[in-house]
Structure formats: structure tokens, C-alpha cells
């Protein structure tokens, strides 16, 4: 009697179960890694903006407020201080970046998550950075966990 070659239904179901378990573990872990990576890109750009603001205050004696993502002012002139930068696409796809001036001597850089980052990053939510270097968040976690 010859034996049939191939897989039995039980063997196939065991493989499907193993693949399902691995997928259930790997996909959420991967998504969290992507969220952290997007957050790190925004944080890096916020630190870059902070450095540019400090250069502007030294040159122009005033900070620059920016309310539009990717439309930061051009290079500083005598009439108009500027930051001469644009928001990288790796940041603008996931965050809106704004710079507000609560007082003449202060600025607050805010990264507000949008799209998939908004729904996936509820722990940290909005990221903030001020002129003293103080880092903050508006989510349920702590600033040290998010920064």
C-alpha cells in the first residue's frame, strides 16, 4: 500500500494557529514602534526649532510665532525675524507643528498629532517644548516616558 504525500488537516491547522499567534503579537508591537519613531522625529524637529528660536532672539531680540505647519518664515531680515526651515515630510504627515508666544520673552513649540498618530498615540498626545527646555505632553503618560 502506498502512502499519500502531503499535509494532514490537523498539521495545517496547527501551522495556521501558530502564524495567527505570532501575528497577534507582532503587529501591535510593530505599530507601537512606528508610533514611537514618528514621535521621535517630531521631538527632534522641535529641538531644532528651539535652537533656531534661540538664534533669532540673539539676532532680532524677539521670538518668532508660527501657526502654519510647513510654512515657517524665511531667513531673518531687519524687518522680519524668521526661522528659515520647513517641516520635514516625516513629521508633517503625523504632526502639526506650531510656535506660540505666550509673552514677548517666551515661546511654546507644540506638536499636535494627526491621522494615525492621533488615534495610536493617546499616551503622549500633544508634545510641547518651551524656551527653558521644559518638555511636556497632554496625554495620560509622563513627559519622561514620552520624551
Placement of each model-derived feature along the sequence:
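Alpha-helix exit/C-cap motif
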Residues: 36-40, 48-70
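N-terminal single-pass transmembrane signal-anchor helix
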Residues: 1-33
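Conserved hydrophobic beta-strand within the GNAT/NAT acetyltransferase core sheet
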Residues: 9-12, 53, 111
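Short, charged low-complexity linear motifs
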Residues: 11-20, 47-50, 77-82
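Periplasmic/extracellular, small/polar-rich flexible segments of pilin-like filament-forming proteins
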Residues: 58-147
Amino acid at each position: 500500500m502506498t502512502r499519500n504525500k502531503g499535509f494532514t488537516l490537523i498539521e495545517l491547522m496547527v501551522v495556521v494557529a501558530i502564524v495567527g499567534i505570532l501575528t497577534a503579537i507582532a503587529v501591535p508591537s510593530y505599530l507601537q514602534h512606528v508610533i514611537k519613531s514618528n514621535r521621535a522625529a517630531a521631538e527632534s524637529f522641535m529641538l531644532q526649532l528651539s535652537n533656531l528660536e534661540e538664534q533669532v532672539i540673539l539676532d532680532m531680540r524677539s521670538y518668532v510665532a508660527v501657526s502654519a505647519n510647513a510654512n515657517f518664515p524665511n531667513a531673518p531680515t531687519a524687518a522680519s525675524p524668521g526661522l528659515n526651515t520647513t517641516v520635514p515630510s516625516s513629521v508633517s504627515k503625523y504632526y502639526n507643528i506650531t510656535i506660540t508666544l505666550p509673552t514677548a520673552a517666551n515661546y511654546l513649540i507644540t506638536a499636535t498629532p494627526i491621522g494615525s498618530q492621533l488615534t495610536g498615540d493617546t499616551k503622549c498626545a500633544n508634545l510641547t517644548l518651551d524656551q527653558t527646555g521644559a518638555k511636556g505632553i497632554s496625554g495620560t503618560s509622563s513627559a519622561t516616558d514620552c520624551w
